Amino acid sequence: DEEGIAISLDDGSVVSTKLLAAADGAQSKVRELCGLQLREWDYGHHAIVTTVTTEKNHNFTARQRFLPDGPLAFLPLQTESGDCHQCSIVWSQQEDVAESLMSLDDAAFCTALEQAGSSSLGKIISVDKRYKIPLKQRHAVDYVVPGVALMGDAAHTIHPLAGQGVNLGFQDVIALVEEVERAVNRGLSPGDMSTLQRYQRRRKPHNLGTMAVMEGFKRLFEDQSLPVRLLRNDGMSAVNRLGPIKNLVIRQAMGLL
C-alpha cells in the first residue's frame, strides 16, 4: 500500500519498509511470494565446490582450465594469518561424473583434482567438505513489483565458467542504490513503481546480454572439434596480446563500461 510493505518473520515479528531489496539467492522465497515468474534452463551439469590447500603459493592469481567435460576454476583465498595456499574451486561436470567424484575419498579426490588442474599449483594437500550444486540458467521475467526489487541470483543465475554472477549482482546493487537516491532526492518513495522500473530497464538488458555471451562461451569451449579448437586458441592468444582489446574485455566483465 502507500505506506509500504509489511514483512512477517519466522519469530512472529513484523518489519515495515518502503522497499524490500530481495537478494535471497537462486531459490528466492521473496520472488516466489511476489508471484514473479522465472524462466529456467537446466545445463545438465553440476558444480563441485570446496576449498583446497595447495603445495604452491597461488600468488593471488585465479586459474581456469576449460576441460572437455566442463571448466575447472581455482580462485585464490587468503587466510587471516596471511597464508596464500588456499583456493576455492568450482569444478563443473556432467551429473554422473560429478556424482562419481563426490563418492571418492579425500585422497582420491585430491589426486583427480591435481590431474584435472595439470598440477599448476603442485600437490593438493587437503580438501574441505565438498558440495554438489546443480547448474541452471535462471532469469526472472520481471525484477520488480511495487515495493520489491530482485537483485543478484534472486533475479538471474548464469553458468559459473567466467565468474560473472557476482559481478552482475554487484551491478544490480549499484543501479538500485542510484535509482533510490534519485527518487528520494525528488521526494518520491523508494518503492515507487516508476523508480523500480527504471532500475529494471537499466539492468535487465545488460543481464540478458551477459547471459547470452556466457552461453556462447560455454558452447564454444564445449566444442572439441579441431577447427574450433584452433580458432578458439588463436582468438584467445590474439586478445591476450592486444592490450587495448584485453583491457576492454576486462572492463566490460567488471561492469565498468
Tell me what each language-model feature is.
Residues D1-I5:
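A conserved short coil-to-beta-strand element within the FAD-binding core of flavoproteins
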Residues E178-L257:
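C-terminal helical "tail/cap" subdomain of flavin- and related membrane-associated enzymes
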Residues H159-D172:
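A conserved FAD-binding loop/helix module that cradles the flavin
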Residues L67-P134:
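Conserved FAD/dinucleotide-binding core of flavoprotein oxidoreductases
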Residues Q27-A62, L72, Q93-V97, L113-E114:
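Central beta-strand plus flanking loop segment that forms part of the substrate or channel wall
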Residues D142-L161:
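Short FAD-binding loop at a beta-strand-to-alpha-helix junction that anchors the flavin cofactor
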Residues D10-L19:
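Core beta-strand elements of the Rossmann-like FAD/NAD(P) dinucleotide-binding domain
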